[in-house]
From Swiss-Prot:
Its EC number is 2.5.1.6. The gene is mat. NCBIfam families: PRK04439.1-3, PRK04439.1-5. PANTHER family: S-ADENOSYLMETHIONINE SYNTHASE. Its cofactor is Mg(2+). Belongs to the AdoMet synthase 2 family. The keyword Nucleotide-binding applies. It catalyses: L-methionine + ATP + H2O = S-adenosyl-L-methionine + phosphate + diphosphate. It comes from the Archaea. GO terms for biological process: one-carbon metabolic process; S-adenosylmethionine biosynthetic process. ATP binds at residues 136-141. This is S-adenosylmethionine synthase.
């Protein structure tokens, strides 16, 4: 059956040439990102358990994880958690299959604890966190939709969007958080995982505003704190030259009041310890960024089942499509993908698969159109590859 693929030329100024561009990334220790990470870790653990016990991934969604902030008393050289962070793992899961009972809650709790251990290395999971799990069973009609055919059918009428390539600012914002928490943190453990990077490009001038929670046990006093933020600033300024030739100004923790020693200091490295709650889907999109200059889906990707949940599959698929179009069709300057499903219809047959293309100057759109259609059709023909990549941990969701 022919697919409803529509490729059109988009007549607008490419993002890279627009006057104002905004890009945000919430770091892996931001409460919203923690929620995303927990939800996805639980989903992937359930997938592995279902495959091990039942031979197939069964219906589940764990995309409602909530974090209720605790209370803390950070200080230089230490600090303590006064009230633990409360984490509620919420969703739906298949708990019995053909007479086999499945320990879904135990699997979920184990996966969540392991994710926190790997992500927030300064958190004491015995003292600092209360973990709860409430997984209900899925509705019978959706479970039926889940298992009808070889090609899964859509669980909902919904859409996913993606774009490529990243702009200079998008690359810079994404890699600033990644490099600070992988490279610099290995030498400067006082950098907390709770970080937000906000990028503004005004013409040829870029401002990066970085809000980074510092960990008190590794910092002796205010002077040490100031030195650390200055070293971070220098690191980012030097790193930025690898991503752009534009002017870059770096600002660290602009909310600090050094006169009163009111600074972003934490015990564990996340503001979830003191007043900052978290929810799935309130942070980064599945490409790792929040990009108001681009079309975005408001739907959470993390925690949704990777078999037929359009909120997950089509957002990931559209992003992969866009990236491959840019790789394989070098005449494309910007491409935006939109995929729309109908509930109960095969996910390889979207109601529409739309590509909006801004070709490079002097390029034949007819050539671009034909080559983009081939990439899109190939991905739709192999749509279940997205499921495999998710289960293997090859695709990020935030």
């Amino acid at each position: 059956m022919a697919r409803n693929i529509k490729v059109e030329e988009l007549f607008q100024t490419p993002v890279e040439k627009q006057r104002i561009e905004l890009v945000e990334r919430k770091g892996i220790g931001h409460p919203d990102s923690i929620s995303d990470g927990l939800a996805e870790a639980v989903s992937r653990a359930l997938c592995r358990e279902y495959i091990s016990k039942c031979g197939a991934v069964l219906h589940h969604n764990t995309d409602e994880t909530q974090i209720v902030a605790g209370r803390s008393s950070p200080r230089f050289g230490g600090g303590e958690i006064l009230q633990p962070i409360y984490i509620l793992l919420v969703g739906r899961a298949t708990k019995e299959f053909e007479g086999v009972d499945l320990a879904t809650e135990s699997v979920a709790l184990q996966a969540a604890r392991q994710y926190l251990k790997n992500t927030l290395v300064n958190m004491d999971l015995e003292r600092d966190v209360i973990m709860d799990c409430k997984l209900g069973t899925g509705s019978s009609d959706l479970r039926d939709v889940f298992k009808r055919d070889r090609i899964p059918v859509a669980n909902d009428t919904s859409f996913g969007v993606g774009h490529a390539p990243f702009s200079e600012l998008e690359n810079l914002v994404y890699n600033t958080e990644r490099q600070l928490l992988t490279d610099l943190k290995s030498r400067m453990p006082g950098i907390g995982e709770d970080m937000k990077v906000m990028g503004l490009r005004d013409g040829e001038d870029i401002t990066l505003t970085i809000c980074s929670g510092m960990i008190g046990r590794y910092i002796d006093d205010l002077d040490s704190y100031i030195n650390m933020t200055q070293e971070m600033q220098t690191y980012v300024e030097e790193m930025a030259t690898r991503y752009t030739e534009r002017n870059v100004k770096v600002c660290i923790n602009t909310g600090d009041n050094l006169k009163t020693s009111s600074i972003f200091l934490t015990v564990t490295g996340t503001s979830a310890e003191m007043g900052d709650d978290g929810s799935v889907g309130r942070g980064n999109r599945c490409n790792g960024l929040i990009t108001p200059n681009r079309p975005m889906s408001m739907e959470a990707t993390s925690g949704k089942n990777p078999i037929n949940h359009i909120g997950k599959i089509y957002n990931l698929l559209s992003t992969q499509m866009a990236r491959d179009i840019v790789k394989q069709v070098p005449e494309v300057q910007d491409v935006y993908i939109r995929l729309l499903s109908q509930i109960g219809k095969p996910i390889d047959q979207p109601l529409v698969a739309s590509a909006q293309v801004i070709p490079k100057e002097g390029t034949s759109f007819a050539k671009v159109k034909a080559e983009a259609e081939v990439v899109m059709d190939d991905w739709l023909s192999n749509v279940t590859k997205i499921t495999e990549m998710v289960i293997k941990g090859e695709l990020d969701t935030f």
